[in-house]
Amino acid sequence: YERRAIIGVSVERSRNTKTSNTQQTIQFSVNHPTLQINNPRQEIKVVVLKNENWNEKITNLQPTFFKANQLLYTYTNKTNFWGDNEYYNFDTKFLRNRSLGIQQIEKKEVYHHYLYPENYNKYKKYTYFPDINGQFVIRTLEANDAEIEADYAMMHFSLNTYQPFSGKEVYVYGAFNNFELTPENKMSFDSENNTYRASFLLKQGFYNYSFATVGEDNKVNLRTINGSFYETENQYTVLVYYKSFGDVYERVIGVDTGFLDQNR
């Protein structure tokens, strides 16, 4: 992109007392000392993106303050995101041996890896454990070039619940399929064991995943199963687009990323 602006991003606990325990707010500035912006409300567009997931974004923001060569975006509520929770992890760098998150391995037409079941608890409290914000890294310790030599394993996911979530579908959710909801990662409910299950192939690597519900509004919801906490360490990216009068297309003139600092 064409770097014509310097972006400063701050991630904080929500300032709204009603959401201070469950949401995070993003404040940012756009500094443009070498770029003349005549009408920022028309020439500038911004996108705030959570964890590189285009399903979780905020747009249509206008500056709240104007300074010389600087635009400030200091909303109280409009740039709030749900904190959600840390992602679950597993590692399949070994096909034949158990690694992080793997409870059992079976050799069939391909290797089948059964993850430790997760348990639904509506009273779940926040517990820190490191993740990579829903992303994944292809890797194997059984070959030299993971990108072309890593193999596939059938991954088995399970979520123990007391009963099915009424009016909601449940999905395994993560960047492994670009945060999409497909028949492949949709979970089915095993009524005999009160367990949601899903199985699909994934290439060897280190993966983050979560569980998402989708109701009649067709909106992805990570809070139903995992809760939402202001402490969760999320990554937020601010992209700034510029289109002056007479330009044919918008240009990205600035990008920056911010993280929640739990020690703040």
Where are these regions (language model features)?
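Short edge beta-strand/loop segments characteristic of extracellular beta-sandwich folds
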Residues: 27-35, 156-162
